[in-house]
Amino acid sequence: GIGFKAGVKDYRLTHYTPDYETKDTDILAAFRMTPQPGVPAEEAGAAVAAESSTGTWTTVWTDGLTSLDRYKGRCYDIEPVAGEENQYIAYVAYPLDLFEEGSVTNMFTSIVGNVFGFKALRALRSEDSRIPPAYSKTFIGPPHGIQVERDKLNKYGRPLLGCTIKPKLGLSAKNYGRAVYECLRGGLDFTKDDENVNSQPFMRWRDRFLFVAEALFKAQAETGEIKGHYSNATAGTCEEMMKRAVFARESGAPIVMHDYSTGGFTANTSLAFYCRDNGLLLHIHRAMHAVIDRQRNHGIHFRVLAKALRMSGGDHIHSGTVVGKLEGEREVTLGFVDLLRDDYIEKDRSRGIYFTQDWVSMPGVFPVASGGIHVWHMPALTEIFGDDSVLQFGGGTLGHPWGNAPGAVANRVALEACVQARNEGRDLARQGNEIIREAAKWSP
């Protein structure tokens, strides 16, 4: 008897611990699991905890060289999902020591890694996570955050306005710059590179950045307002991405952009450090998120991707519109919008928030509403998102029958009218159309 017993044993013997009291330093995760027929929920939950932390499929003698009690993930609660057959929420607690400081990449490799391919589960979805201050404090977080951005731009008391330049592919740099100028001159705060625009044969990045910088300065001089264009620094290598960010800064641009799902968290965090050190704002686009978050029973919910981005670093992030052309439910969307911009968010299952999240002093991120919205949505958007948001109208600006600048004017007039009406105590939900119609009389 050397005390080592080889062989396969049930995960639930070691990793299902219903009487465990979670620690303040634990990283907590809620998983929606659909076990294979015949697999008990406790075994499935324990398997998730084990496979995303210290466990493997069999007992190994090297287990004796460490303290599993200290390092193992524990499934501490399981609840059936109402209205679903054979679906459960498993709550898992991970000890802080399992994760590298300041690395979203490492955190995701564990908690949303191999376990998602696990045979005993038909499907698995990460619904929410609780990041303790002990861990979140090791991350850079947003390079600047909502308050500093408002101070840099000198824009207060209203949402910010943006516009994605369309057609997204095919314009020359010169014509692209012209479209940027017209939108900014008309009254928008920002214009945006479409996420597909990197550096293609029809428009190389350096040419675009230069013509855009010219447009920025011209529009600023004529309007007396600070303007920005999200120059997309996303590239095939981290080095090339940094080169583009440096060039954007040297051209006098106030903000750059990155696709954090396709570019990856490692690249994103590097860029966030550069942006903080050099006074650049960082706009984050979420291309590829729907591949990961759209299925109800498998994948990662966007609120988890949003929390990860707040830690990795970004000043703006796309987060759905509630009213536009892309999917999103109102309460759930507002739940993760608050997770992005508030300090302290109470657990509230009706909004999809499984854990109370305390960000302590980490700056907030502007949620960006973008995708199929236009001027008639303005009252709803103002009411749903409030002041701390960026509202982006691509086709909703450039599709104006008189052209880009009048489209921009229309959006700015509508926004100012909605903010004023709200401040005067009018009901945006009920009187929205009327407010917009009134405003239109004074708009070109």
From Swiss-Prot:
GO terms, biological process: photorespiration; reductive pentose-phosphate cycle
Keyword line: Calvin cycle, Carbon dioxide fixation, Chloroplast, Disulfide bond, Lyase, Magnesium, Metal-binding, Methylation, Monooxygenase, Oxidoreductase, Photorespiration, Photosynthesis, Plastid
Cellular localisation: Plastid, Chloroplast
PTMs per UniProt: The disulfide bond which can form in the large chain dimeric partners within the hexadecamer appears to be associated with oxidative stress and protein turnover.
Keyword Flavoprotein (UniProt): no
Cofactor detail note: Binds 1 Mg(2+) ion per subunit.
Known function: RuBisCO catalyzes two reactions: the carboxylation of D-ribulose 1,5-bisphosphate, the primary event in carbon dioxide fixation, as well as the oxidative fragmentation of the pentose substrate in the photorespiration process. Both reactions occur simultaneously and in competition at the same active site.
Note: The basic functional RuBisCO is composed of a large chain homodimer in a 'head-to-tail' conformation. In form I RuBisCO this homodimer is arranged in a barrel-like tetramer with the small subunits forming a tetrameric 'cap' on each end of the 'barrel'.
Protein name: Ribulose bisphosphate carboxylase large chain
